Amino acid sequence: MESQQLSNYPHISHGSACASVTSKEVHTNQDPLDVSASKIQEYDKASTKANSQQTTTPASSAVPENPHHASPQPASVPPPQNGPYPQQCMMTQNQANPSGWSFYGHPSMIPYTPYQMSPMYFPPGPQSQFPQYPSSVGTPLSTPSPESGNTFTDSSSADSDMTSTKKYVRPPPMLTSPNDFPNWVKTYIKFLQNSNLGGIIPTVNGKPVRQITDDELTFLYNTFQIFAPSQFLPTWVKDILSVDYTDIMKILSKSIEKMQSDTQEANDIVTLANLQYNGSTPADAFETKVTNIIDRLNNNGIHINNKVACQLIMRGLSGEYKFLRYTRHRHLNMTVAELFLDIHAIYEEQQGSRNSKPNYRRNRSDEKNDSRSYTNTTKPKVIARNPQKTNNSKSKTARAHNVSTSINSPSTDNDSISKSTTEPIQLNNKHDLHLRPETY
């Protein structure tokens, strides 16, 4: 009877029922099924009282749980499973929410949905208040970022102790592909610069300007984990995080090195496409420059074969080297080394021809001395030339007169005439000049 009566009252716990039955068995030896009508009435009153208490105070389990609902308690939210970011090493709420974020924003000010948050991302105060960003947030990568020095807009200034500002810092876009990581990290670095964290970014030599603080490292880790999901990270980034999941600085340093390498590759391609050579520089220097560019490109995965390299080199030749375009352009198996052999041959020929030419250039002081000596030596010549010319003219007249008289004279014969042509004619003048027939 008692078991039938208990089955009619499901709200009475099984433990209490067993306890009552056990107590009856311990104190008395009465059959538990043999119960009087008065006892049944007592059970009815007890069950009615229990039903009234359960009606006024409903159990917490009566409300169904929503697995996607963010509980106000941070500990009740399941942490995200993000691969390289181990949840056993996650930071506490006090570590993730320092008080010194007034200068460059706070991880809690970043837009994300509640079910993506782990306990370390919960901001202080009501969890239902999330900042609303203007329409410019989430724009493409090509859109310019706000000016440096801006901070996030604080939508909960009444409950937060952070300094509220009117301007905001646009966060980087979400990484959606490993191939987009080089472009994404540029926007992430710009985001850090706009957040007054440009001093912690590694420079060209791989070292930051100043030492990063613990709060800044927390901010760096939080923002990188939120906007760069682990499934979209490149392999080399995952390798770094597998060693130290908080070493975001090493990732930034490697990214900057890759940016510089990409810039060098672009410069090398432009330089190789715009080569110019006319022999004004040594052929050895020109060959070293070209071969270094080709080697760097090949090492970085940009392969330049001999055919393409020779075409680019020959296109930039000018002057005496220009004819190499037409003598070698049909050789399909020509190498860069063979082309430079021809360039060296022309350059050496040019240098040899220049060295063989006489050098007429003289010092300026020697030219002045020569001009002075020339003026001094020409003056006596000018003075001595006029009387000589006069005497010569007189001797010619006297000679002509003597010749005419000798011809007209009967005592002269042809032998004397022929003899006079071979012997000098003696003239009686004060200069005693000796003239030959070919002089007049």
Swiss-Prot record:
It comes from Saccharomyces cerevisiae (strain ATCC 204508 / S288c). This is Transposon Ty1-DR3 Gag polyprotein. GO terms for cellular component: cytoplasm. It is found in: Cytoplasm. InterPro entries: TYA. Residues 429-440 have a biased composition (Basic and acidic residues). Keywords: Cytoplasm, Phosphoprotein, RNA-binding, Transposable element. One of its GO terms (biological process) is viral translational frameshifting.
